[in-house]
């Protein structure tokens, strides 16, 4: 189970005093999140998803996958929350060195013609299908990618057969993509109207790619459900998600920290960190408020960003994701008459070495005046992916509410789009 370790901030904050002070406010925010019907209907469709997960819809997705037994590749088209959750879950749970069928590839998450051209070349001799994800259907990058991939798949299989290889995840009532899907006769799945993209990982947005990737969705939702129950506590002292939210809020407002780094020590967590960045940046970065969020993957980044973190501007704090047990591990062999001077670690596993690196780094950074939060999970499995993703969603809702902003909208992203469309149409 997840454990939050706050010891790395005690030298910087009178945590216990602040916690007593903010506990009543957190209780009020919790009650608003769970009882404000208007708020729930507009923004909080994700809040009780683990409680009311649609297992019939899951079976429908499994049947769809089973109807394509020889599929080599599923191309998931989406950007932002329409792909980050799926990519995070798949990379959290699968090794890049063991190719499973179908392989899940992504498109429409940038505007690179080079990427798309090479993807099309890769698909030439593959048996493939498309899952296009967009609530509106007008987001430029996925819409363009879908236009090109749709043309390609229709040329390869013919229009009639191609329509059975295109799965659309979109709004249930309106939108360009829904209209196109209905006209063409594509299989559709629903993005709930009250669920924003960055909170959509447990909807069909994430679940359909997870099914095609052969992930254990049932265990994942058990983890999310346990996180729902654990974070349903209105008492700050019984709710680790709220403690994390308050800690980062206090480091920002009382210690003037401008940036939070999510620090991981497993490559499997790289895409999870990208998902986390969108969750917090898009939720909190408004009204000239909020922390800038970034991520590092150690020990790799200790050899690049480590110098700045240790001795640079004291603008940041770290949240360390500590995975204490790894299923696949490697033992350092003992070599007689060693020439590489490494027998001092002979017999140790890489996990044991990684843990020592983590502990040493945390200690050094705290001594270097960099506060550290630590979130500990026992392993990388479907259950803990579900738990961790829901934990951060709930923490984000509380953290943004403490800032006094609406954590569930994103008005700022429309500004560049307006200018972009004006330039493209001029």
Curated annotation (Swiss-Prot):
The keyword Cytoplasm applies. One of its GO terms (molecular function) is monosaccharide binding. Keywords: Cytoplasm, Gluconeogenesis, Glycolysis, Isomerase. The active site is at residues 282, 303, 417. InterPro entries: G6P_Isomerase, Phosphoglucose_isomerase_CS, SIS_dom_sf, SIS_PGI_1, SIS_PGI_2. It catalyses: alpha-D-glucose 6-phosphate = beta-D-fructose 6-phosphate. Its main location: cytoplasm. Pathway: Carbohydrate biosynthesis; gluconeogenesis; Carbohydrate degradation; glycolysis; D-glyceraldehyde 3-phosphate and glycerone phosphate from D-glucose: step 2/4. Its EC number is 5.3.1.9. The keyword Transferase does not apply. It comes from the Bacteria. This is Glucose-6-phosphate isomerase. The lineage of its organism: Bacteria, Bacillati, Mycoplasmatota, Mollicutes, Acholeplasmatales.
């Amino acid at each position: 189970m997840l454990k939050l370790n706050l010891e790395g901030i005690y030298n910087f904050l009178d945590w216990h005093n602040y916690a007593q002070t903010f506990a009543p406010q957190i209780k009020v925010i919790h009650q608003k999140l769970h009882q404000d019907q208007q708020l729930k209907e507009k923004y909080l469709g994700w809040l009780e998803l683990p409680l009311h997960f649609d297992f019939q819809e899951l079976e429908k997705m499994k049947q769809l996958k089973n109807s394509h037994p020889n599929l080599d590749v599923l191309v998931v088209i989406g950007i932002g929350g329409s792909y980050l959750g799926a990519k995070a879950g798949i990379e959290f749970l699968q090794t890049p060195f063991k190719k499973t069928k179908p392989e899940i590839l992504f498109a429409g998450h940038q505007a690179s013609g080079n990427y798309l051209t090479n993807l099309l070349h890769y698909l030439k001799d593959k048996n493939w299908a498309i899952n296009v994800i967009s609530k509106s259907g007008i987001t430029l990058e996925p819409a363009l990618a879908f236009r090109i991939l749709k043309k390609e798949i229709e040329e390869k299989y013919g229009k009639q057969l191609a329509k059975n290889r295109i799965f659309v995840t979109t709004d249930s009532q309106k939108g360009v993509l829904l209209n196109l899907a209905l006209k063409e006769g594509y299989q559709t799945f629903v993005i709930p109207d009250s669920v924003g993209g960055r909170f959509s990982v447990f909807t069909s947005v994430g679940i359909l790619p997870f099914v095609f990737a052969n992930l254990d969705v049932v265990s994942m939702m058990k983890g999310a459900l346990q996180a729902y129950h654990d974070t349903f506590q209105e008492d700050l002292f019984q709710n680790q998600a709220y403690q994390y939210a308050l800690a980062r809020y206090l480091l920002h407002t009382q210690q003037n920290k401008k940036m939070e780094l999510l620090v991981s020590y497993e490559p499997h967590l790289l895409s999870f960190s990208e998902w986390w960045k969108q969750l917090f940046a898009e939720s909190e970065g408004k009204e000239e408020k909020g922390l800038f969020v970034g991520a590092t993957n150690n020990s790799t980044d200790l050899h690049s960003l480590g110098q700045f973190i240790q001795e640079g501007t004291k603008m940041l704090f770290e949240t360390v994701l500590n995975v204490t047990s790894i299923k696949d591990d490697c033992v350092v062999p003992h070599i007689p008459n060693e020439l590489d001077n490494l027998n001092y670690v002979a017999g140790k596993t890489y996990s044991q070495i990684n843990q020592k690196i983590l502990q040493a780094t945390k200690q050094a950074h705290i001594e270097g005046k960099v506060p550290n939060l630590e979130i500990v999970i026992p392993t990388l499995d479907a259950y803990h992916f579900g738990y961790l993703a829901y934990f951060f969603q709930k923490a984000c809702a509380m953290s943004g509410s403490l800032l006094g902003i609406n954590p569930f909208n994103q008005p700022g992203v429309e500004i560049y789009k307006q200018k972009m469309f004006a330039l493209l149409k001029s």
